[in-house]
Amino acid sequence: FTGHLAADLFWSLRNPSQVRWGDFVNAAVEAGIAALPIVGLVSFLIGVILSFQAAIGMMQFGATSFVGPLAALGIVREMGPLITAILLAGRSSAAFAAEIGTMTVNSEVDALVTGGLSPIRFLVVPRVLAGILVMPILTLYADIVSILASMFTMLAYGIPFINFYNGMVAAVSLEDILSGLVKATLFGVVVSAVGCLRGMQTGTGAAAVGISATRAVVSSIVMIVLVDGVFAVISYKTGSVSYTHLTLPTKA
């Protein structure tokens, strides 16, 4: 499956006019625009919780001014991409598995093969391309919402917006943002591809589609955590993760 998918994705770059862009748009709308409310809500809560818990610990050392920069780094590097990917695993991966699983049960996938069409090229590629598009956008949206939530939370500890902003700008680099977006793109591939794979592996029977959807969610989350762990190790080995540039924000 992985080899066929990689080959068909490369084929789609060479033959964009033959991609089913209608399915791509439908998948992008369902996975992206329809997910904005839940991603925004969860990201806001994550921003509040993360900064609040960090502030409790930092208050013991009189370093509450570090909460903003550290929260922003945690959101951009880890929490933004990870939470967004898990939410999409619960929504889109299950939806893709259910859609393709229903087609498998109804022998529509077999009909494509009989007609000389590639199910991966016909069904999977548009959904994977949609995942590649929407995941970085949703992650950037989640980062912004979470950071704004952290800003409001820090007001309760007497840290003005300008202090939070100055600390965040000093702490978060373009490399941090790009690292999170690259990770989000990989998550987009994983979530959409796993959902489609589980859909194509659907068996027979009334419960088959539900089982495939459940397996898609579980497999997607496991793969997300695995990819995140590998990405963290690579970042550490290459030296792209460092906190030595952090400085205590000065009061306005």
Describe the function of each predicted region.
Residues 1-84:
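Core alpha-helical transmembrane segments of integral membrane proteins
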Residues 99-125, 209:
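Short cytoplasmic-facing helical segments at TM-TM junctions of multi-pass membrane proteins
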Residues 217-232:
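Final/C-terminal transmembrane alpha-helix of multipass membrane proteins
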Residues 27-30, 107, 118-139, 216:
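Start (N-cap) of specific transmembrane helices in multi-pass transporter permeases
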Residues 45-49, 85, 125-154, 194, ...:
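Hydrophobic alpha-helical transmembrane segments that constitute the membrane-spanning cores
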